[in-house]
């Protein structure tokens, strides 16, 4: 039986949705704002349209064994989504980062979901994902606020 898991992290930023989106959508710059969690980042290939949109593949993590992620959602200023291109105990990992502007700034929501057949793997990965997505969300907000000055 396949089990589904989801982790949702929320944050608030004074930066604009456009600034937040520009940082998260540029796969080559993740190592600049997400270090030391992400020490390496690069575009492996661009989208069929020749940009960083849907279909582009980034490599993030360790230079020798990066994680490959394909962009699945590219809505500038609103949403960025990706899937991990991995084989292993988890399947169908999908993540998206959404930006909603309101009177107080921008609400940032980073959501990751995946499937696995093993309950222990699902629970352990959820704990790891909570730390990773929480760290990425905080680092993204800090970098965007510095950039917006």
Where are these regions (language model features)?
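Short, well-ordered strand-loop elements centered on a beta-strand within folded domains, enriched
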Residues: 54, 81-83, 104-112
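Beta-strand elements of well-folded, non-transmembrane domains
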Residues: 13-15, 88, 101, 114-118
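Hydrophobic/aromatic beta-strand elements that line small-molecule binding cavities or substrate pockets
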Residues: 9-11, 67-73, 93-101, 112
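Coil-to-beta-strand transition motifs
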Residues: 4, 90-92, 101-107
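Glycine-rich portal/gate segments that line the openings of hydrophobic small-molecule binding cavities
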Residues: 32, 41-88, 139-149
